Design a protein with these regions (language model features):
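Short amphipathic alpha-helix that is part of the acyltransferase structural core
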Residues: 1-32, 130
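Short, basic/aromatic recognition patches
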Residues: 32-38
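A short helix-loop-beta-strand connector motif used in the catalytic cores of GNAT acetyltransferases and
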Residues: 39-50, 129
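Conserved beta-strand in the GNAT
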Residues: 50, 56-65, 72-77
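Conserved acetyl-CoA pyrophosphate-binding loop and the N-cap/start of the following alpha-helix
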Residues: 82, 86-94
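Conserved active-site alpha-helix within GNAT-family acetyltransferase domains
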Residues: 89, 101-106, 111-137
């Protein structure tokens, strides 16, 4: 059975499992296995949701926000062995519900790697007049 939780103070096991999810999603490549970085990510997020199977974290997602008007959902991923079960959709639903209950009504995200089919049924639409951009630092 999959359970969903808001995480704000991860323990060492949580941190290891979250690092593994970042690596599995290929967002970090061979980047640092830095538990303190992950702890700051979790604590600095407006909300951070994990999906658990028993004691194992099998999915996650988070929102960043100014806490007043806008929020961005990011880092939504599910372990390959647990995909296609609605876990990512439930993570996003829980994040959106929290953001809306906190009064944040503009919620954005960048759908990567053909993930638009996940977000469309949850009410997200493409923005024809916008282009996602980023600036990388070294």
């Amino acid at each position: 059975m999959i359970t969903f939780h808001f995480l704000s103070d991860p323990d060492a096991a949580d941190l290891r499992q979250i690092i593994a999810l970042y690596r599995d999603a290929e967002w970090w490549g061979s980047g640092p296995d830095d538990p303190e970085l992950v702890r700051r990510i979790v604590r600095g997020s407006h909300c951070f949701v994990v999906a658990r199977s028993g004691t194992s974290i099998v999915g996650m997602g988070r929102a960043i926000s100014d806490g007043a008007s806008d929020a961005w959902i990011q880092d939504v991923t599910v372990n390959l062995d647990f995909r296609r079960r609605g876990i990512a959709s439930e993570i996003v639903r829980r994040i959106v519900a929290r953001l809306e209950s906190d009064g944040l009504m503009w919620i954005g995200l960048v759908a990567e790697r053909n993930t638009a089919p996940l977000y469309g049924p949850l009410g997200f639409e493409g923005m024809a007049d916008a282009l996602p951009m980023r600036r990388r630092t070294t």
